[in-house]
Amino acid sequence: MTAKDILFDADARAKLKVGVDKLANAVKVTLGPAGRNVLIDKKFGAPTSTKDGVTVAKEVELEDAIENMGAQMVREVASKTSDVAGDGTTTATVLAQAIYREGLKNVAAGARPIDLKRGIDRAVKEVVAELRTISRSISGKKEIAQVGTISANNDPEIGELIAEAMDKVGKDGVITVEEAKGMDTELKVVEGMQFDRGYLSPYFVTNSESMEAELDDALILIYDKKISNMKELLPILEKGAQSGRPLLIIAEDIEGEALATLVVNKLRGTLKVCAVKAPGFGDRRKAMLDDIAILTGGTVISEEKGYKLENATINYLGQAARVSLDKDNTTIVEGKGTQEEIKARINEIKGQIDKSTSDYDTEKLQERLAKLSGGVAVLNIGASTEVEMKEKKARVEDALHATRAAVQEGIVVGGGVALIRAIKGLDNAKPDNDDQKTGIEIIRRALEEPLRQIVANTGTTDGAVVLEHVKNGEGDYGFNARTEQYENLVEAGVVDPTKVTRSALENAASVASILLTTEACITDIKENTPDMPAMPPGGMGGMGGMY
């Protein structure tokens, strides 16, 4: 086992503070509309330029082990806030640094760290309650665009695109962000349910120009096993042909004799048919087949449920106004399922999302939800260089996440003003002793820090003067760092999602409290391994004359 080095109390906390400050100072220059860019060296490829706090935080790795532990703890604040709310990472970092700095002063003066932590926790609880009180819900396209603009580092084009996408697919709809082939950034909306499986044979194509199979007023057969024998498929195929309507077959796979027979009948014109593999794998495939069945008013033919393919009747088939397939995707538009069943299924999936503990499962459930409730919007992000495209794509993803947060929990006034207004909530915090009271005062001081930093990044105005001016104001009145004017910030479009502000404070206080109550740090002792000796001139013995 490697030998360990242990550092205690004041020495440990001082070193942790150096690490916290190094990371926080690199991150906080990006805060606000006047925030600066940070250039990050990449071992392979061009350097990355970013104004995204969490991207900067993730790149910081310090040489000293204990300093690095301090930096990594604050990095966790930024990452957690980004994961939960999509924005507010820089605010969270600034708050964590301020809480730790003020807390350390009091620990050095003899305050008990555990009571400081209890005071901080009580203060945060009251501030969060006050934030919820001053929060207002958003619904309009204009308000959504404002949130998107702020979260995309004041890029109105991105804000408008996100508002447009939410307008098209609804607030529960799936919005994906992809890299465009050209320089233009555009929104594309896929209506209906789309899944990533294309036709099994190009012979099913009905439009040879676009290489698509288009089925109007289609019947849909949904089967959860492989079909290789024509005998089991024939009865339902004959019933479908008698109706004169095109038939889409969705199954785990269709191969051999069954696929060949379908292709031959399609080419002869005796049968309008197309076959496609079922989407997903395992339990997710079963769930998606059930979704398709509910959307189209059909039944999944499954032996687990007691249904056999050879006994299937036309009543088992789903229906849709249009189905279009290319080699990669299948889109079902206007399924004929009942609204009651679709709504019940949507509520069931929402319940699963609430209980889900995995980000991956949550994402897949949200995709299923969107496909049932309104479609998918794709934001194709264009830029003139790869560096710009990556930076812009990261901003769009953050803005999208933050906009969803705003729809969930509402908005508060931006520009650091909401935290100033929420200081009022600290009057309700009841400490049990003086050290807890000090913990509450630490939060009071820390809540001013984001506004101070936003002003500092403008480089033209004194933060203390602005702070007093804003404190003397009321409601939405604050300092607009973009125009450097005092005005009603909500009317000026300077707003933050409540979830972002709340998460930033909760995560910052949590990590800063852990750091304050840390009494020892344990790290590996670095081994001094001697450098490899240089090779003697002339190479190894017996290699004379080699070049």
UniProtKB/Swiss-Prot annotation:
It comes from the Bacteria. Gene3D superfamilies: GroEL (3.50.7.10), GroEL-like equatorial domain (1.10.560.10), TCP-1-like chaperonin intermediate domain (3.30.260.10). GO terms for cellular component: cytoplasm. It is an enzyme of class 5 (isomerase). InterPro entries: Chaperonin_Cpn60_CS, Cpn60/GroEL, Cpn60/GroEL/TCP-1, GroEL-like_apical_dom_sf, GROEL-like_equatorial_sf, TCP-1-like_intermed_sf. The keyword Chaperone applies. The keyword ATP-binding applies. Its main location: cytoplasm. One of its GO terms (biological process) is protein refolding. Residues 527-547 are annotated as: Disordered. Its EC number is 5.6.1.7. Together with its co-chaperonin GroES, plays an essential role in assisting protein folding. The GroEL-GroES system forms a nano-cage that allows encapsulation of the non-native substrate proteins and provides a physical environment optimized to promote and accelerate protein folding. Belongs to the chaperonin (HSP60) family. This is Chaperonin GroEL.
